């Protein structure tokens, strides 16, 4: 019998995507870039590009895990491996086409904005918003392609929302992690919109927040993993999606607000006490630990309240 897997096929998808991307960067992109910037090494170029791609790769793992489990692509065999590789090639091609359209559209629009003497913050906001929009479009395309592959190539039968009863908490975990990822993307978009209206605020490009966003995503998914495994109930074998959706949304929104409050309070205290010269890595780790603890408490409390109703 073919072994059932939940995370091996999504991991294969991400590794295949990273391998294709690396080959394209090394064989196609870097030779062109090195002509213009001879001082840029291959390692520095790859690290810079993968910093930009880190958000998408972490999101790909959680969302492909959800897609594959949802459409019952869980059997590890030759057909599923070929299907995963085909989906990887499809997504890479779609992203390349979207990237080309983005570059052409942005160059035309930015030239127009510069001619109209638009603010630099508006240009950065436009770039950041476009990046987030392309991420979401690529994920929608991946979901549609996964459904078509499961239906017409693998011909799997799938009770879409009701698991087979063996591990319903896995579906809840994947569903929640996918939602948290999308919430992080929405939070980035809102940050980009709000920042220009703050005193001296200029939104940073999306790549500047790559490591922070990926770390926040992993921490949030880890917290949800702990909460879901301990508290996720099944009533009559049917997955309770509605309270799960509400609890994840509330937990994520409240956690983002708490982290924003902690950051604002810390900045205010540092400026008020004139201790910014002594503020370093230790204090940042303390802020992170407090944010994680409060996020864990909020998630447990909200999940408990929603499922007791």
What role is predicted for each listed range?
Residues 107-120, 157-160:
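Short, flexible helix-coil linker/hinge segments at the edges of structured domains or between repeats
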Residues 160, 308-309:
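Short, Lys/Arg-enriched, Gly/Pro-containing loop segments at transmembrane-helix junctions
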Residues 71-81, 158-166, 233-242:
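Membrane-interface helix-boundary motifs at transmembrane edges
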Residues 1-2:
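Non-catalytic accessory regions used for complex assembly or targeting
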Residues 5-32, 48-70, 83-109, 127-155, ...:
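Alpha-helical transmembrane segments and immediately adjacent membrane-interfacial amphipathic helices
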Residues 37-44, 116-124, 199-205:
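Juxtamembrane membrane-water interface segments that cap and precede transmembrane helices
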């Amino acid at each position: 019998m073919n072994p059932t897997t939940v995370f091996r096929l999504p991991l294969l998808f991400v590794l295949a995507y990273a391998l294709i991307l690396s080959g394209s960067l090394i064989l196609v992109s870097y030779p062109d870039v090195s002509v213009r910037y001879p001082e840029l090494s291959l390692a520095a170029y790859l690290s810079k590009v993968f910093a930009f791609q880190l958000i998408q790769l972490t999101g790909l793992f959680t969302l492909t895990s959800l897609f594959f489990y949802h459409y019952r692509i869980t059997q590890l065999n030759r057909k599923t491996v070929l299907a995963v590789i085909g989906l990887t090639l499809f997504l890479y091609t779609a992203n390349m086409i979207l990237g080309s359209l983005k570059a052409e559209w942005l160059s035309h629009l930015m030239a127009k904005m510069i001619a109209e003497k638009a603010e630099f913050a508006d240009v950065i906001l436009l770039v950041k918003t476009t990046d987030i929009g392309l991420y979401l479009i690529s994920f929608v395309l991946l979901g549609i392609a996964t459904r078509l592959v499961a239906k017409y190539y693998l011909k799997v039968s799938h009770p879409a929302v009701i698991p087979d009863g063996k591990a319903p908490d896995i579906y809840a975990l994947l569903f929640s992690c996918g939602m948290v990822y999308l919430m992080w993307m929405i939070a980035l978009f809102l940050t980009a919109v709000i920042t220009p209206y703050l005193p001296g605020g200029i939104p940073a490009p999306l790549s500047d927040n790559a490591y922070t966003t990926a770390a926040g995503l992993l921490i949030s998914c880890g917290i949800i993993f702990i909460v879901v495994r301990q508290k996720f109930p099944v009533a009559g074998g049917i997955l309770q999606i509605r309270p799960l959706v509400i609890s994840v949304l509330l937990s994520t929104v409240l956690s983002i607000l708490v982290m924003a409050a902690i950051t604002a309070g810390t900045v205010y205290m540092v400026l008020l006490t004139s201790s910014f010269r002594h503020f370093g890595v230790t204090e940042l780790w303390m802020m992170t630990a407090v944010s994680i603890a409060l996020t864990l408490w909020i998630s447990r409390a909200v999940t408990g309240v929603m499922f007791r109703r």
